[in-house]
C-alpha cells in the first residue's frame, strides 16, 4: 500500500501581519515547515509532495528539501489561489499511490503516532481525519 503525503505550504499568513510567511518563520532554529517535513520523512509514508507559493518553489527546493536532505520529497509544486486549488495541484502531482494524506505545513506538531494511526485507519475505512481535544486551562 503506497501512501503519499501532500504538505501544503502556500499560505500567506496574512493574519500574522508579517513579511515572512508563517511556514518559513524560524522556530527553534529551523523554519516551521521543517518540523512537519521531518516527521513525515521519518514516517512510513512513501512519498511527499510539497505545495508552496509561486515565488517559493525554488526556495523550498534548495533551502528546505536539499538543505535538510528530505529524500521522500518527490515534487515541489506551485499552490493555487486558495487551499482547494493547492490540494488539487498536489493531487495532480501524485504518481501511482493508494492513499493520500494532506497536512498543513504551518502545523509543526504532527507526530509519528498520528501518521501511523492514520495510515492504519485508511487501510480499514478509506478516509479519516485527525483531531486533538481542546483543553481550557483557565476559569471564566
PLM region spans:
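Short, Lys/Arg-enriched, disordered terminal segments
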Residues: 1-2, 96
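N-terminal glycine-rich phosphate-binding loop and ensuing alpha1 helix
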Residues: 2-57
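Residue-level signal for pocket-adjacent positions within structured domains
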Residues: 11, 19-22, 47, 72, ...
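Short N-terminal micro-motifs specific to bacterial/archaeal maturation
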Residues: 15, 23-24, 48-51, 74-81, ...
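Generic, ordered loop/turn and secondary-structure boundary motif
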Residues: 17, 25-28, 71, 110-111, ...
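Short amphipathic alpha-helical segments
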Residues: 18-21, 61-64, 113-115
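Conserved N-terminal catalytic core of the sugar/cofactor nucleotidyltransferase
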Residues: 34-97
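Conserved beta-loop-beta/alpha segment of the NTase-like Rossmann-fold superfamily
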Residues: 75, 81-140
Amino acid at each position: 500500500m503506497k501512501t503519499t503525503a501532500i504538505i501544503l505550504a502556500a499560505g500567506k499568513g496574512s493574519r500574522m501581519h508579517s513579511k515572512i510567511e508563517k511556514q518559513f518563520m524560524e522556530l527553534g532554529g529551523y523554519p516551521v515547515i521543517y518540523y512537519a517535513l521531518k516527521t513525515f520523512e521519518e514516517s512510513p509514508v512513501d512519498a511527499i509532495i510539497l505545495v508552496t507559493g509561486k515565488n517559493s518553489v525554488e526556495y523550498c527546493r534548495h533551502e528546505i528539501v536539499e538543505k535538510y536532505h528530505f529524500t521522500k520529497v518527490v515534487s515541489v509544486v506551485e499552490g493555487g489561489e486558495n487551499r482547494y486549488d493547492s490540494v488539487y495541484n498536489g493531487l495532480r502531482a501524485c504518481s501511482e499511490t493508494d492513499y493520500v494524506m494532506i497536512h498543513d505545513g504551518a502545523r509543526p506538531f504532527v507526530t509519528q503516532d498520528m501518521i501511523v494511526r492514520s495510515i492504519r485507519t485508511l487501510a480499514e475505512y478509506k478516509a479519516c481525519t485527525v483531531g486533538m481535544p481542546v483543553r481550557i486551562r483557565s476559569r471564566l
